[in-house]
Regions:
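Residue-level signal for inorganic ion chemistry
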Residues: 80, 111, 155, 159, ...
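Helix-rich, typically C-terminal accessory recognition domains appended to large enzymatic cores
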Residues: 499-554, 558
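Active-site cores that bind ATP or allylic diphosphates and position pyrophosphate for catalysis
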Residues: 154, 162-300, 305-315, 324-326, ...
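N-terminal Rossmann-like or analogous alpha/beta NTP/dinucleotide-binding catalytic cores
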Residues: 19, 23-180, 279-293, 337
């Protein structure tokens, strides 16, 4: 067991348990941080506790500007956003940009745009590249260097942190020496710089030796750390004994140190993050303790899973296009569809709630972190598609047009051109069967529209005369010869259908489907087969929305032209 040192402070001088004078920590702090003249008390006063109602939660989205927004980011962010929103709290955005080498230009704006698309709006924090609002900033970590160093200096003054002059090569040697040790890292007998004297430290600094600042961990190798995760429940882990780096050689903090200080000063109450960070919780709780902070509550989210070859794997940024949030915009899934789907995998009881509250906003749902999956939600494209079809079916034609038109201008120039020719015509097409008691659910995404409406435009219509059911080419020839003479676009729907039924008997069919089923050998088909022949002639398809509405929109000239061409085909291909 590592021997625990008991520090006794007498004014500015510090002693270990044997009474040996070791270090003036105040002098050491001034040596390491000569330009830092503020104290933690200054920042505690500058960023006071938030005046919120009891139970209100303060959450955050804290991305690194190193790439695109992926689905896992959005999923975790949505959980944080709902947690704050449902409790009357605060949701803010903080950019963790301390690693400037990995920073990608435009990444912040791209991520914020992604959040905006999916209706996640921050109450404070970063709202654009270099632009922020709120009283608890700066919200860019790169602008908070003085804050971190103030708390670092305070730890040095308390004998809780020390400078380390070990090189990368020396750290590698330590790793090799540790071999198969259970605990690997800079700790115990391997922490070579832990007990350097003031004179040694001063000499090293005067010699220009670079240094990092390390935590003097108070952890005990035989003790456990206990915490209650909001998603995974009670967790037990060994205490942290590693003297981790707090500040790198350039004075920039590590994630661990910055996280503790930022979430304390920004008065965060709940941190929702990926479960890859569970291993760091003992360290983070230890940092909160040595800094004198009240710890946040953690909710560790399992990764989104995907079925593959009978098993499951993590949704991959490299393998799966749907891992990128931009994918859903590119193919045209409405944001409302993605949000609705996301709610079903965030909380399993959402679907029951939705059935009972069909017109309610998703933000009325009583989201609960504790009801998130502890083992990882399964991404289901089929379910997303079904949900999206349902969402789009409830939209008005005007809304479908506006959203798909905006999408087409960015992703489908040909569709944008079709729309621009006659916007009202496009809206009328999209309105077919939309106002029924049970609207059709043909569209799952905006990229489905070009094919869905293609037969309504001559330049995109591709004739196809393949029939189904009882319809034969010979019957089609007979039906079209008679129907061409019957076409009258002044008819209402009942009159139009009566004309179709009137040509059934002359063609050897029955206008009564029930009669056909009772005596199929007596007829060549029924009124449904006759309608299918007309449908195929006009649209090239056996299944479409309401044929009467399609006929009315196409107009008499185009209807007769298409019927004539189809008739010619069936005459040549009996």
């Amino acid at each position: 067991r590592r021997q625990r040192q008991m520090c006794i402070r007498d004014r500015n001088w510090n002693f270990i348990h044997k009474g040996e004078k070791m270090m003036n920590f105040d002098e050491l702090a001034d040596l390491l941080f000569p330009s830092i003249d503020k104290t933690p008390e200054y920042y505690e006063e500058k960023y006071p506790p938030r005046q919120l109602k009891e139970g209100a939660r303060v959450t955050r989205f804290a991305p690194s500007p190193t790439g695109y927004l992926h689905f896992g980011n959005l999923y975790t962010c949505f959980a944080s956003y709902l947690t704050a929103k449902n409790t009357g709290g605060v949701f803010f955005v903080r950019v963790e940009d301390t690693d400037q080498k990995r920073k990608v230009d435009g990444a912040v704006d791209a991520m914020l745009k992604g959040l905006e698309v999916y209706t996640v709006k921050a109450d404070e924090g970063v709202i654009g590249e270099g632009n922020e609002i709120g009283d608890y900033g700066p919200y860019y970590q790169s602008a908070r260097k003085e804050i971190y160093q103030t708390y670092a200096k305070s730890l040095v003054k308390q004998g809780l942190a020390y400078p380390c002059f070990c090189t990368a090569e020396e750290i590698d040697e330590i790793r090799q020496q540790q071999g198969n040790d259970d605990i690997k890292g800079y700790w115990g007998k391997y922490a070579k710089c832990r007990d350097l004297s003031f004179e040694q430290i001063k000499q090293n600094i005067e010699n220009g030796m670079p240094w990092t600042l390390r935590l003097k961990s108070p952890g005990d190798i035989e003790k456990k750390c206990y915490f209650d995760d909001m998603i995974k429940g009670k967790i037990e882990m060994p205490e942290n004994v590693i003297d981790v780096v707090l500040l790198k050689t350039d004075g920039i903090p590590t994630y661990h140190f910055a996280h503790a200080i930022d979430d304390h000063l920004m008065r965060t109450t709940h941190v929702t993050r990926g479960d890859e960070w569970i291993a760091s919780v003992p360290l983070h709780l230890q940092l909160f303790k040595v800094l004198g902070f009240k710890p946040v509550k953690y909710a560790h989210v399992a990764p989104i899973m995907k079925e593959e070859n009978g098993g499951k794997r993590k949704l991959s940024k490299r393998k799966d296009p749907e891992a990128a949030v931009s994918y859903y915009s590119e193919v045209g899934y409405p944001a409302a569809s993605v949000n609705e789907y996301m709610m079903t995998i965030l909380n399993s009881n959402f679907e029951d709630w939705r059935r009972a509250n069909q017109s309610a906003s998703i933000y009325d749902f009583p989201f609960n972190l504790k009801k998130m999956s502890a083992s990882g939600a399964l991404f289901d494209f089929v379910k997303l598609t079904d949900i999206s079809k349902n969402v789009i079916s409830k939209m008005s034609a005007e809304e479908v047009f506006e959203l798909s038109n905006a999408w087409s201008k960015e992703y489908d120039e040909k569709l944008a051109v079709l729309y621009a020719k006659d916007e009202q015509y496009a809206k009328d097409i999209l309105n077919i069967d939309r106002e029924n008691k049970k609207p059709r659910k043909d569209l799952a995404k905006w990229s489905d529209i070009p094919d869905y409406i293609s037969y309504m435009y001559d330049e995109t219509f591709t004739p196809c005369y393949e029939l189904c059911g009882n319809a034969t080419n010979e019957l089609a020839k007979s039906v079209l010869e008679k129907y061409i003479d019957e076409v009258n676009l002044n008819d209402d729907k009942d009159a139009w259908f009566s004309r179709i039924k009137s040509i059934c008997e002359p063609c050897g069919c029955t206008p009564n489907v029930k009669e056909y089923k009772q005596n199929p050998d007596n007829f060549k088909g029924h009124v449904g087969d006759v309608s299918t022949i007309i449908r195929v002639a006009l649209t090239g398809r056996t299944n479409t929305p309401d044929l009467f509405s399609i006929t009315a929109l196409l107009g008499e000239k185009r209807v007769k032209e298409r019927l004539t061409k189809a008739l010619e085909y069936y005459k040549e291909n009996k």
